[in-house]
Amino acid sequence: MDIRTITSSDYEMVTSVLNEWWGGRQLKEKLPRLFFEHFQDTSFITSEHNSMTGFLIGFQSQSDPETAYIHFSGVHPDFRKMQIGKQLYDVFIETVKQRGCTRVKCVTSPVNKVSIAYHTKLGFDIEKGTKTVNGISVFANYDGPGQDRVLFVKNI
């Protein structure tokens, strides 16, 4: 398994698989090209035999340099349960730690039970939100009206 930083030219390759990897959910608009142009040093792709198996898009906060943020990550459905996601998170965390970050944050939708379980398994804590949905603390309207989100934080 190879891990490398992303490049601008990876945009089409990554965005072309989003809907397929997420079971038909329309997610391409959640990952604009700007991430591939401005956050290359903290975003990564895994591959095997020149085929992409996973990716992680993240960055160090400019507003709070001790905080890093994972914007989007994914693993090819045929390669799940092989620790690829964990490897991507580990490389990202080590990279931002070297830049002085002491915590990593990320968000997910309250309906994404797999993501919630995955992040808690990786040691992320759910931040106390503004309401509770199905026993999970969420921030109401975090990404706009009706777009509640679960916020995670992990001290590193």
From Swiss-Prot:
Give one GO term, molecular function aspect. acyltransferase activity, transferring groups other than amino-acyl groups
InterPro entries on file: AcTrfase_GNAT_prd (IPR017255), Acyl_CoA_acyltransferase (IPR016181), GNAT_dom (IPR000182)
Segments forming a coiled coil: none
* Segments forming domain N-acetyltransferase: 1-156
Which superkingdom, per the lineage? Bacteria
Which positions, given as ranges, span the membrane? none
Q: Gene3D superfamilies attached here?
A: 3.40.630.30
Q: How does it assemble?
A: Homotetramer.
Q: Which PANTHER family match?
A: N-ACETYLTRANSFERASE (PTHR43072), RIBOSOMAL-PROTEIN-ALANINE ACETYLTRANSFERASE (PTHR43072:SF36)
Supply the name of the protein: Uncharacterized protein YqjY
